[in-house]
Regions:
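Nucleotide-sugar donor-binding patch of glycosyltransferase catalytic domains
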Residues: 77-141
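Donor-binding and catalytic core of enzymes assembling or modifying cell-surface/extracellular glycoconjugates
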Residues: 4-91
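Short, solvent-exposed loop/turn segments at secondary-structure boundaries
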Residues: 1-3, 118-119
Length: 141
């Protein structure tokens, strides 16, 4: 799972470039503390906490999005299935498991596929500016 401060920095890059007006934070109720931390730490009003939404509410939020960025999770796969441009932040999972999906994986430089590393620190290799540039390239193509 990517770190909250990295999501905050990435969101700031998109917002400051005028590429979004608001950002849905999609997670389950058990991860609501993460959405709250992002909102509290950022002190920004453009975040919308969706942790209390049911599946229909999550689908509505995703369908109202121009694109989706997230960890390798259920909502990431749901976004791709709904036909939304979907970018997966992958550093600790095999990206090859996404080969039949519409998810565009963003991996750190030097990434090695087919290795499971269950250490969250591996996600620190994905820097917000790098992720932003990768997504921006894909959005413009």
């Amino acid at each position: 799972m990517w770190f909250e401060e990295d999501f905050i920095e990435l969101a700031s890059l998109f917002y400051n470039k005028g590429l979004c007006d608001y950002i849905y934070l999609i997670c389950g109720p058990d991860k609501s503390h993460i959405a709250k931390k992002i909102i509290d730490d950022s002190k920004k009003q453009y975040f919308i906490d969706c942790s209390n939404k049911d599946l229909q509410g999550v689908i509505l939020a995703i369908k109202n999005s121009d694109f989706y960025i997230g960890n390798n999770s259920g909502p990431l796969n749901l976004s791709a299935a709904l036909g939304i441009k979907t970018f997966g932040l992958i550093a600790n999972d095999p990206v090859s498991e996404l080969k039949y999906s519409n998810i565009k994986p963003i991996t750190p430089e030097g990434y090695v596929d087919n290795i499971w590393i269950r250490d969250r620190m591996g996600m620190k290799k994905l820097k917000p500016n790098y992720v932003f540039n990768q997504i921006q390239k894909n959005l413009s193509s």
